[in-house]
């Protein structure tokens, strides 16, 4: 920031001009010793210079004042004793000055942000951005600016905004917006805002009500977002914002559960009085002062949006200073108390246990479970104490040390944390869960059946958390006790008979009332008499069995459990926050050893050595994906076929890898016949075998035919002379028919005679057929030289128009290259390369499904009477009345009657707490749009990452050029009409429609959002008759269809999609699908063209391929020599589709040569090269590549390739010519003999 170091000597006035002198100059290099006189002269010169500078120097700044000596203490006279002075006030710590970035943000915000006033207070803010004023729609009030308040605003309810044009005098002084939002930190009124994963977040507690409308700025003071609200997500708050995309279109991003941040006060109700929820009236304003009234106030506002504010105000007692974590969260559970409930297994059978297990949740990873019991932890009867737990010891509350608590499955569990009714533990796998404690010599425990298992993360089934590996998203129960928006339902406890309140006084039954309490009594002697008393009361009954006394406990809540009876009459409900809620986090997962990879010709061999069961998935990147999915448990070796289209495999938690096959092979297509056969046999084994068999068959047929013709001709010649004795054969026939001389009987004798008497003639006789064969071969070669060529050539890609149109393959990374030719101008090089392509369908969210939770309210037990069900609009609500029940409570009878009692049992479905982090979304998918990001180069202009729509209609402005691409030649999409999104995976799944879900299958629980009230459930829920002597609500239902679908969901679309598609979310899209072709049209501006007279003219072009490896990434090297009219730059391009050139242009001298690289799929390429306006043909032979498989796709097209090399064609012509020569020779001999015989006869 400061380029110069601080001076450590008094400043001097510089001599104009004076260069800066470094106080710490670099060391000088060694110099020879100077004479003493020269050194003295130099020192004198420096001293004079210093004196001159010092005379011009200004006065140095004053230094610190000198320390004064303390005077000797003088003896003071004895002063009279004064009162003790109060301690001095504590000096307040000075607030730290904000940083430069924050100061700039605050200044810009204060100048261009205006408060919105409502009833004399700030309700939100409006900001002026880009010539318009933006005001949140949910913020009521008037802008505190006369000019802006007079503007007529337009409403955009979809974005929760109002906007209008600012006056002309204010347009020059407005904030500018930007769509650039790289991940990092931004500024707003309260400090830094973090932007990551397309979300703006701030630490929890930073920002809140009244901050709606504030802008978020980048370091250059540009607005990147406008805040509308927020949602608490654990330790951070996700902001609901309005942003702009790259096209300047407004985009609203609202996290789940976000609330608008206007400062409008939410009102609560108490009886007929309304009051601000954060300021309850003084009568029930504090739980410690008025517990019953406070609970009633909370129950009446159960459904209020500001219930949390009211609960917080009631617990903190309005202005009382509290400790941060302990008092804020633990004190909520001081409104509740433990209870005794039924437990099916207490170690010795069924019992009423003080630590009965209500619920167990084990949907998190890494073996964590959350246990809900009837005991309470971290609380005592007199307040909060983390070292204690409390439970009901009969009718009294008792507290013991928490160290006596334990939990176990197949082995002891590790207690991680505890709070209220809940325990967070990490347990080993097991089929049962036991929770207990020891109170002196008495042991209390409760065991229920619940399967606990370790749930690994990712694609490897490890059994213990690893020390290191890869971080993957997972679900955990947060260790914090902070409220997370999840509640546990509470209510005031029902009446339970307490026989200790009854005693005999003389001959009458006396009811003893504890101090400050009320007791409800019910007596039958013989008339029924009931009532409520706050003091001791003596009845007219003479037997204790004739009365029941119930202690009314309306100062504490208990959990709304199905194991407790409900109070009589209309009972209101309350709620407290659930601790240890499931949240999305990061877990360390194992990373399987890398596979040992072996590359072969068109084959990939993987040697796998898993340490635990590991998933291996593969797919081909062509039109037929051929996906495979298998769990590997033992070391094994697997083989896969790899083609030029590509192959992808994913091993365990490693990222997917893609490989492509090259046209490698043994042998040499330009070598000897056996090398050619080996080469083609490795590439095309079946075709090579068929070709060789065909050649052998042709040779055999040719030889047999030739021999038969010659034999037939000879017989025709010799037969007439055999019939005439002593006939003399003409010389011509003797030569043609090889007539045996009289001195030899057969061929062997003739050859023996010639060998012994005239070897020269013997060799001449042998060479005659060979010479004839060679002559025939030459004749056939001349006939076949004009046959079909073995190379196919693509059409030229040049264009002779200002507007250039072409078709390019839809393959990412493969550039399209061409020379755009325009009359009178030099050719302009054009290159278009796809960076990414996106198929974005129109997705309509049908519903969200997740795991359900069965809610069992406390049953209504009517003693000696009947009750009935009432209709309720709850999901899958079931209600049934059972008669003839005889419940017991803690060992005593609950009712007088034996068979006239009734119980109304209720049960319904609600979302489980895990739904916030573990849910599936069902979408209906329709035809969407195709977008692409392209890199374009024309001439000397390059444009990177241009966004275009691939629809053939929407042009994109690329500098001064206009580009229109699309539509795709194939209207294809990897998505079916119905898809399911689960986490980061997408599945094609035919889910049921909304409202038609079946029990035990996908969609048994449906809702539009995670917080909406349109919850639908079908779980085959059936109520069962309660057992005698037990207060409970038994039921049966189908297992969760969502959990069943998760086990049977199969492979995600990302593992089975053809054409190498990568499936992504937000929004739902398929990226980089190599399907079809893309037509394109580009209008190139005149400025990109150069007059042909200004470019060099090239002549005498000669091209020589120096090195070539076909089917390899630019494995060809060629050199072109030239002569140019002048030096300059020339574009180079191959108009043939056989080769792809790496270079775009070259720099030419007057004469010389340049080298370029090319890629081709032909083994004998012959392609044209255009340099400026001149064209030369390059030819050469290419060798096969050495690498069988590579990790990059081919840069050339394989549509036009040579199947057979020129050398192979030459050998094939020789073979065909040789075999044909035998037939031709026989035909010639037959014709000559037939002609001679015909002439002889006539």
From Swiss-Prot:
Modified residues (Phosphothreonine): 113
Region (Disordered): 1-104
Protein name: Structural polyprotein
Annotated GO CC locations: host cell cytoplasm; host cell nucleus; host cell plasma membrane; membrane; T=4 icosahedral viral capsid; virion membrane
Keywords: Capsid protein, Cleavage on pair of basic residues, Disulfide bond, Eukaryotic host gene expression shutoff by virus, Eukaryotic host transcription shutoff by virus, Fusion of virus membrane with host endosomal membrane, Fusion of virus membrane with host membrane, Glycoprotein, Host cell membrane, Host cytoplasm, Host gene expression shutoff by virus, Host membrane, Host nucleus, Host-virus interaction, Hydrolase, Lipoprotein, Membrane, Palmitate, Phosphoprotein, Protease, RNA-binding, Serine protease, T=4 icosahedral capsid protein, Transmembrane, Transmembrane helix, Viral attachment to host cell, Viral penetration into host cytoplasm, Virion, Virus entry into host cell
Start-end of Basic residues biased regions: 66-104
Residue numbers spanned by region Binding to the viral RNA: 83-113
Active site per UniProt: 138 (charge relay system), 160 (charge relay system), 212 (charge relay system)
EC number(s) reported in the record: 3.4.21.90
Site (Involved in dimerization of the capsid protein): 186, 219
Record-annotated membrane-spanning stretches: 689-709, 760-780, 781-801, 1219-1239
């Amino acid at each position: 920031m400061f380029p110069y170091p601080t001076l450590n000597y008094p400043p001097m006035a510089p001599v104009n001009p004076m260069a800066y002198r470094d106080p710490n100059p670099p060391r000088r290099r060694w110099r020879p010793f100077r004479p003493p006189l020269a050194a003295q002269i130099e020192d004198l010169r420096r001293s004079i210079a210093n004196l001159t500078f010092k005379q011009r120097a200004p006065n140095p700044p004053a230094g610190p004042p000198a320390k004064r000596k303390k005077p000797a203490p003088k003896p003071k006279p004895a002063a009279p004793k004064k009162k003790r002075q109060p301690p001095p006030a504590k000096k307040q710590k000075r607030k730290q000055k904000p940083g430069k970035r924050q100061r700039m943000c605050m200044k810009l915000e204060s100048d261009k942000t205006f408060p919105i006033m409502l009833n004399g207070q700030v309700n939100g803010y409006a900001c002026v951005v880009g010539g318009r004023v933006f005001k949140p729609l949910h913020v009521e009030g008037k802008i505190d600016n006369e000019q802006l308040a007079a503007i007529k605003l337009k409403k955009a309810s979809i974005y929760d905004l109002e906007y209008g044009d600012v006056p002309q005098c204010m347009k020059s002084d407005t904030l500018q917006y930007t769509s650039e939002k790289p991940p990092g930190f931004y500024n707003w009124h309260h400090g830094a805002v973090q932007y990551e994963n397309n979300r703006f977040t701030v630490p929890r507690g930073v920002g809140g009500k009244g901050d709606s409308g504030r802008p978020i700025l980048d370091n250059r003071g540009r607005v990147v977002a406008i805040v509308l609200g927020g949602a608490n997500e654990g330790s951070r708050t996700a902001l609901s914002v309005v942003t702009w995309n790259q096209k300047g279109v407004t985009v609203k991003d609202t996290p789940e559960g976000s609330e608008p941040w206007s400062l409008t006060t939410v009102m609560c109700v108490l009886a007929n009085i309304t009051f601000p929820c954060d300021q309850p009236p003084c009568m029930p304003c504090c739980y410690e002062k008025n517990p019953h009234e406070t609970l009633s106030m909370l129950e009446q506002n159960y459904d209020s949006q500001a219930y949390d504010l009211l609960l917080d105000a009631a617990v903190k007692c309005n202005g009382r200073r509290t400790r941060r974590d302990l008092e804020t969260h633990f004190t909520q559970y001081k409104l509740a108390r433990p209870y005794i409930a039924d437990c099916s297994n207490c170690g010795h059978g069924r019992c009423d246990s003080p630590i009965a297990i209500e619920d167990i949740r084990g949907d998190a990873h890494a073996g964590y479970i959350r246990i809900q019991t009837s005991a309470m932890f971290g609380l005592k009867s007199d307040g909060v104490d983390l070292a204690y737990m409390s439970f009901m010891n009969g009718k009294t509350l008792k507290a013991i040390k928490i160290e006596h608590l334990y939990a176990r499955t197949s082995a002891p569990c590790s207690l991680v944390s505890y709070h209220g009714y809940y325990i967070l533990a990490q347990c080993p796998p097991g089929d049962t869960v036991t929770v207990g404690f020891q109170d002196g010599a008495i042991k209390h425990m409760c065991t229920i059946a619940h399967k606990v298992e370790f749930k690994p993360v990712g694609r490897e089934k490890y059994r213990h958390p690893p020390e290191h590996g890869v971080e993957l998203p997972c679900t955990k129960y947060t260790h914090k006790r902070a409220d997370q928006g999840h509640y546990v339902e509470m209510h005031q406890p029902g009446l339970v008979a307490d026989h200790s309140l009854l005693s005999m006084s003389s001959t009458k039954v006396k009811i003893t009332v504890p101090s400050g309490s009320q007791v409800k009594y019910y007596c039958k002697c013989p008339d029924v008499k009931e009532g409520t008393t706050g003091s001791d009361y003596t009845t007219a009954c003479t037997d204790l069995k004739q009365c029941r006394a119930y202690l009314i406990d309306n100062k504490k809540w208990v959990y709304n459990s199905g194991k407790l009876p409900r109070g009589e009459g209309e009972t209101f409900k309350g709620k407290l926050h659930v601790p240890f809620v499931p949240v999305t986090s990061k877990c360390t997962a194992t990373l399987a050893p890398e596979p040992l990879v072996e590359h072969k010709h068109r084959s990939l061999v993987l040697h796998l050595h898993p340490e635990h069961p590991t998933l291996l998935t593969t797919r081909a990147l062509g039109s037929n994906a051929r996906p495979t999915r298998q769990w590997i448990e033992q070391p094994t070796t697997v083989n896969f076929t790899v083609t030029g289209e590509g192959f992808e495999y994913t091993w365990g938690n490693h990222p997917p890898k893609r490989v492509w096959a090259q046209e490698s092979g043994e042998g040499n297509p330009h070598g000897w016949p056996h090398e050619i056969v080996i080469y083609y046999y490795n590439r095309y084994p079946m075709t090579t075998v068929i070709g060789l068999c065909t050649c052998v068959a042709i040779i055999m047929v040719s030889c047999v035919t030739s021999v038969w013709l010659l034999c037939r001709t000879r017989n025709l010649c010799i037969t007439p002379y055999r019939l005439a004795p002593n006939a003399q054969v003409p010389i011509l026939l003797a030569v043609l028919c090889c007539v045996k001389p009289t001195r030899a009987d057969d061929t062997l004798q003739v050859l023996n005679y010639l060998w012994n008497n005239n070897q020269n003639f013997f060799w001449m006789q042998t060479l005659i057929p060979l010479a004839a064969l060679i002559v025939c071969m030459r004749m056939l070669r001349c006939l076949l030289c004009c046959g079909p060529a073995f190379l196919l050539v693509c059409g030229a890609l040049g264009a002779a128009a200002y507007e250039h149109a072409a078709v390019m393959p839809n393959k990412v990374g493969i550039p399209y290259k061409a020379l755009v030719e325009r009359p009178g101008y030099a050719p302009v090089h054009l290159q278009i390369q796809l960076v990414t392509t996106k198929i974005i369908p129109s997705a309509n969210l049908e519903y969200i499904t997740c795991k359900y939770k069965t809610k069992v309210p406390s049953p209504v037990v009517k003693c000696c009477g009947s009750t009935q069900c009432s209709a309720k609009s709850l999901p899958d609500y079931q209600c049934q009345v059972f008669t003839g029940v005889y419940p017991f409570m803690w060992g005593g009878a609950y009712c007088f009657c034996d068979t006239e009692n009734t119980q109304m049992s209720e049960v319904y479905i609600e979302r489980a707490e895990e739904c916030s982090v573990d849910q599936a979304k069902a979408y209906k998918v329709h035809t969407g749009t195709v977008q692409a990001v392209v890199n374009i180069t024309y001439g000397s202009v390059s444009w990177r990452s241009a966004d275009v729509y691939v629809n053939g209609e929407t042009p994109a402005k690329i500098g001064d050029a206009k580009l229109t691409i699309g539509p795709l030649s194939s209207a294809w999409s990897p998505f079916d009409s119905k898809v399911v999104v689960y986490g980061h995976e997408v599945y094609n799944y035919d889910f049921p429609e909304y409202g038609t879900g079946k029990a035990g299958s996908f969609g048994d629980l449906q809702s539009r959002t995670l917080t909406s009230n349109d919850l639908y459930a079908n779980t085959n829920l059936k109520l069962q008759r309660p057992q005698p002597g037990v207060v409970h609500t038994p039921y049966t239902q189908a297992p969760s269809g969502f959990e069943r679908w998760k086990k049977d969901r199969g492979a995600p679309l990302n593992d089975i999609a053809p054409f190498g598609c990568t499936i992504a979310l937000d929004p739902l899209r398929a990226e980089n699908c190599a399907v079809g072709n893309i037509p394109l049209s580009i209008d190139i501006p005149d400025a990109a063209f150069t007059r042909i007279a200004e470019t060099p003219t090239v002549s005498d072009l000669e091209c020589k391929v120096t090195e070539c490896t076909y089917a390899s990434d630019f494995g060809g090297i060629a050199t072109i020599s030239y002569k140019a009219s002048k030096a300059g730059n020339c574009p180079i391009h191959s108009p043939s589709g056989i080769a792809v050139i790496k270079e775009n242009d070259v720099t030419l001298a007057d004469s010389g040569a340049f080298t370029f690289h090319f890629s081709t799929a032909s083994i004998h390429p012959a392609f044209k090269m255009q340099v400026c306006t001149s064209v030369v043909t390059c030819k050469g032979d290419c060798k096969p590549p050495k690498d069988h498989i590579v990790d990059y796709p081919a840069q050339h097209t394989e549509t036009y390739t040579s199947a057979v090399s020129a050398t192979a064609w030459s050998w094939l012509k020789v073979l065909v010519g040789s075999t044909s020569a035998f037939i031709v020779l026989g035909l010639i001999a037959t014709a000559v003999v037939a002609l001679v015989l015909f002439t002889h006869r006539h």
